Amino acid sequence: MQHESPIIRRKSTRIYVGDVPIGDGAPIAVQSMTNTRTTDVEATVAQIRALEKVGADIVRVSVPTMDAAEAFKLIKQQVSVPLVADIHFDYRIALKVAEYGVDCLRINPGNIGNEERIRSVVDCARDKNIPIRIGVNGGSLEKDLQMKYGEPTPEALVESAMRHVDHLDRLNFDQFKVSVKASDVFLAVDSYRLLAKQIDQPLHLGITEAGGARAGAVKSSVGLGMLLAEGIGDTLRISLAADPVEEIKVGFDILKSLRIRSRGINFIACPSCSRQEFDVINTVNALEERLEDIITPMDVSIIGCVVNGPGEAEVSHLGLAGSNKKSAFYEDGKRQKERFDNDDLVNQLEAKIRAKASVLDQANRIDIKQED
């Protein structure tokens, strides 16, 4: 069954990205970034919709040129999830996407020009209630900080971040969040820990350039898991060299494992051994694929034998304990009279899980605004 997380989250200020609350105890938002050419409006819209389907709260889109800004206008008109525009160097692009309804600007004040240009972007953001994300990356530190520290260090990343924070402070702008990403787990974790002691603004978590689907998921889980367990973090992105949809899935799996935010089915399944009375691995894989559309939080245990099966089933919403030819079925911790044919488990379990999801959440829709 679902249990409350023991984690006490860091206190932070509240901002809004579109209608998604960030910080001050709001549910941790999961986001990704498109990897299509932004000027390919059709492909970008399709990818954003795919991300939204698996639960993305926010989607970031790179806007490197004015042509991309014009494409962003068309993209924004066709999607409902809040969009962050990722902008570097040309402050005029930030002003343009602000006209087109962007929900958040990802910039570094230090790389978009002089004080006058920074002020024009900040004034525009203030007038239109658009928050800003300051994004510091260990791979693109300012040259003077590289010279000062010799290599990326937590102190270097945080000093870079605080420079940008000071820019916004001087302009009396406080609607922003900050990230200090690095590809090294310990560098990223120590940077976020240090930054969390210095500012009250929301923190966006990420291990940048984490790697492919498997290695990147592991690295991100280790790094973000440490921070989240300490209560640090208000939004997150899992950076994978893979389909962005996988980033959202991994992000929710991390939050689910820490009992911070649950979305969809939490499958409790044994790794299988010679005691299994049915094919556990293929059963779980098939159910995960079939039930991706279920977002109602629930625990489903699928254990191939009677050694651990009953115990896990008794603390799950639904449970299966393998037995010869027919397996025992549990609901809300109680063994039911009906037994499931081991040759047709996937179809039988899918029907039961869908019915249970409907009971647990009649609307079959939980969103971050309602969770707040």
From Swiss-Prot:
Gene3D superfamilies: Dihydropteroate synthase-like, Sulfite Reductase Hemoprotein, domain 1
SUPFAM superfamilies: Dihydropteroate synthetase-like, Nitrite and sulphite reductase 4Fe-4S domain-like
The protein's annotated pathway: Isoprenoid biosynthesis; isopentenyl diphosphate biosynthesis via DXP pathway; isopentenyl diphosphate from 1-deoxy-D-xylulose 5-phosphate: step 5/6
Keyword 4Fe-4S: yes
Keyword Magnesium: no
A GO MF label: iron ion binding
Cofactor binding, note field: Binds 1 [4Fe-4S] cluster.
UniProt GO BP: isopentenyl diphosphate biosynthetic process, methylerythritol 4-phosphate pathway; terpenoid biosynthetic process
Binding site for [4Fe-4S] cluster: 270, 273, 305, 312
Catalytic reaction equation(s): (2E)-4-hydroxy-3-methylbut-2-enyl diphosphate + oxidized [flavodoxin] + H2O + 2 H(+) = 2-C-methyl-D-erythritol 2,4-cyclic diphosphate + reduced [flavodoxin]
Cofactor(s) listed: [4Fe-4S] cluster
Entries under Pfam families matching the protein: GcpE
Keywords: 4Fe-4S, Iron, Iron-sulfur, Isoprene biosynthesis, Metal-binding, Oxidoreductase
Coiled coil: none
Transmembrane segments: none
Superkingdom in the source lineage: Bacteria
EC number: 1.17.7.3
Function: Converts 2C-methyl-D-erythritol 2,4-cyclodiphosphate (ME-2,4cPP) into 1-hydroxy-2-methyl-2-(E)-butenyl 4-diphosphate.
HAMAP family noted in UniProt: IspG
Family affiliation: Belongs to the IspG family.
NCBIfam families in the record: ispG_gcpE, PRK00366.1
Protein's name in the database: 4-hydroxy-3-methylbut-2-en-1-yl diphosphate synthase (flavodoxin)
Organism: Vibrio campbellii (strain ATCC BAA-1116)
Lineage, uppermost ranks: Bacteria, Pseudomonadati, Pseudomonadota, Gammaproteobacteria, Vibrionales
Gene coding for it: ispG
